[in-house]
């Protein structure tokens, strides 16, 4: 069995989780972007990652989820705290790490039950969605603080420091 592709996905996924953690530590959860508070943008991004990375057809919402809590088009009575979002991120990380540890490269071509995309397509779609929202959320931090939240890459050879929350 080959694991070259899965190992590349693992590396990029771990980097994604580090960047999400930095984002959650630096953003203002109450900042309003497109009529919604940033906490809701964070939850939308994390919920999508949780639902779509593995198999959206076999997904169970987290226990705290209520209808439309993940929607950026519908306001919510509930509010999620930074701590709740950080805990949710850690649960997603554990779930996805276990999933990736169960795969080999050949399995990336398989189409999960009920899906139209193969496993690789589902994963790639979440990288795209995740980083689009991370950029939006980090932009609000830049606007408010005039500081650029650190976005970590996979090589660490850019010459930039990899320590701290800001570039």
Question: What is each of the regions a protein language model found here?
Answer:
Residues 13-17, 93:
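Hydrophobic faces of stable alpha-helices that mediate helix-helix packing
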Residues 13, 34, 42-46, 78, ...:
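Generic structural signal for well-ordered secondary structure
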Residues 10, 21, 26-71, 113-167:
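Short, contiguous alpha-helical
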Residues 19-20, 81:
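A generic structural signal for ordered secondary structure
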Residues 73-110, 120-131:
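Acidic/histidine-rich alpha-helical segments that form the ligand environment
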Residues 1-14:
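Extreme N-terminal tail/first-helix region
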Residues 16, 27-31, 103:
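Short secondary-structure junctions and interdomain/linker hinges
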């Amino acid at each position: 069995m080959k694991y070259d592709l899965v190992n590349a996905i693992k590396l990029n996924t771990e980097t994604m989780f580090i960047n999400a953690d930095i984002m959650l530590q630096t953003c203002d959860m109450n900042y309003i972007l497109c009529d919604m508070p940033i906490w809701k943008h964070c939850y939308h991004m994390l919920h999508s990652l949780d639902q779509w990375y593995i198999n959206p057809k076999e997904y169970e919402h987290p226990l705290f989820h209520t209808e439309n809590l993940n929607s950026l088009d519908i306001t919510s009575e509930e509010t999620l705290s930074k701590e709740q979002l950080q805990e949710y991120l850690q649960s997603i990380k554990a779930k996805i790490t276990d999933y990736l540890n169960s795969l080999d490269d050949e399995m990336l071509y398989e189409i999960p039950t009920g899906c139209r995309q193969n496993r690789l397509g589902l994963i790639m779609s979440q990288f795209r969605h995740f980083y689009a929202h991370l950029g939006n959320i980090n932009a609000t931090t830049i606007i408010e603080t005039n500081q650029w939240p650190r976005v970590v890459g996979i090589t660490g050879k850019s010459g930039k420091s990899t320590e701290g929350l800001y570039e």
